[in-house]
Amino acid sequence: MINDAHCHFFSPQFFGALARQQLAMRAAPSAMVAASASEIYRELQWDDPVAADTLADRWIAELDRHGVNRSVLIASVPGDESSVGEAVARHPSRFVGFFMLDPSVTDAIERARRAIDELHLRGICLFPAMHHVALSDQRVRRIVEVAAERPGVIVFVHCGVLSVGVRRKLGLPSHFDLRLGNPIEVANLALAFPQVPFIIPHFGAGLLREALIAADGCANIHLDTSSSNSWTRYTPGLTLDAVFNTALAVVGPSRLLFGTDSSFFPRGWQKGIYDTQKQIVEDAGVSAADAARLFGGNFDRLFPAS
């Protein structure tokens, strides 16, 4: 059984947000958003998502084609909770909804409550480097309190290297403060809220050592394996095999979550990432039971099917 703990839902609203940023850079009228979004599809050579329900159905067909049982869908811009909420409502047994939240906006708490209570989303995604809000900030603590009050809700924290490929391709500025994405700061939150599961994606995205230290000290911190993990190039000689072996030794198979970081069509679900990681796990001599946990069981434990 395969469950994917990290897929992005690039909805029409996601592309609309990019279009508005492009138009602002050009000092162009905001009324041109639809035309600008169409231009983005052509420039990237990506498919038009058409509508949230259409995109949700396409993802189901794609998961079925690859034998994937369930998947996380991440609303990839703040304010796009409704798109993922629509996908989850349409396919509740297949999708688990996450949403990106900017702690600096005045209605962050209300947005979080609505996303969880009304739209039935189950993961709050924090990007401290992107939104320039430290994890030690009281605004973040209040957001985690929302999760703590709602059993079954997790907090996902992007740490380490943050490079948004679509922004780079479109020439959009990415003023990220990478100093704020330290997994050790996640440990402080995890210790304060032991009932809340935390997920650090991409093995810490270049901060593997810190991610392992944080997870070793906090039983409620999980690591996801998603993406090609190209951050390994920052450490001479480091291989993805070594990353898996070290994470398995320190964190164990019960707190690793397989993910691909799939996002757009026509590329669809990234089977190559699954194939690579499956081979690494087999080569490491991981038992069938532990491999089943990593590739699906841990997901179902964190997100029991409703």
Where are these regions (language model features)?
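Conserved, mostly hydrophobic/aromatic
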Residues: H6, L63, V84, A115, ...
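Mid-to-C-terminal alpha-helical segments outside catalytic/metal-binding sites
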Residues: M1-A5, P12-R65, R70, R114, ...
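Active-site gating/metal-coordination segments in enzymes
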Residues: N69-R70, S76-R168, L172-D177
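Catalytic pocket-lining loop regions of alpha/beta-barrel enzymes
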Residues: R122-G123, S136-L257
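Active-site environment of divalent metal-dependent phosphoester hydrolases
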Residues: F10-P12, P78-D80, S104-D107, V161-G165, ...
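Short, surface-exposed connector motifs at secondary-structure boundaries
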Residues: R65-R70, P92-F95, L191-F198
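A general structural detector for well-ordered alpha-helical segments in enzyme core domains, enriched
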Residues: R58-E62, S83-A87, R111-A115, R139-I143, ...
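Short beta-strand segments
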Residues: D4, V72-A75, I199-P201, D224, ...
